[in-house]
Amino acid sequence: RRRLEPEIAQRSCRLLSDAELDRLEREAVGFGAQDRTMNDIYDSHHEFHHALLAPAATSWDIRILSTLWRASERYIRIGWGSLDPDPQEHARREQYHVELVAAFRQRDPEVAADAVQQHLSRNEQTALLALGPGRSRVAPVS
């Protein structure tokens, strides 16, 4: 994912319409709703990331990414599910995804790639913390 997603983001940021970015921003804001758990948003979260990359992704890219996304699903649900009781987690979830859309809006390939790379790194670190010893007291990565 670290090699493929940033590379596709570099191309996609120039192809996404303003209307699609507006729609994705509204979706990102919805990820922060206090009443939505990770299980509630998982499918729309997957679709959000797919939509960010879709304009520049080949069918082969989507096939590979879908396999990788589904393979990581259990860890995402465990890691972020354990954070759901923390009201600040919902705000972070929203912020991280709004930041992704903002990076794509700049239409700068390096900015978009860096934002995706940072997003993946945060996710990896949070998942490792959530799955490690003492996971009941997970502190999310900022």
Residue spans for each PLM region:
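Hydrophobic, amphipathic alpha-helical faces that serve as interaction scaffolds
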Residues: 1-16, 46-86
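Hydrophobic packing residues in well-ordered alpha-helices of helical domains and bundles
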Residues: 21-24, 41-45, 61, 65, ...
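Short linear motifs at protein or domain termini
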Residues: 1-14, 19, 128-142
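C-terminal all-alpha effector/ligand-binding and dimerization domain
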Residues: 25, 29-33, 77-142
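Alpha-helical structural segments
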Residues: 3, 7, 11, 22-30, ...
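Amphipathic alpha-helical linker/stalk segments
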Residues: 14, 32-35
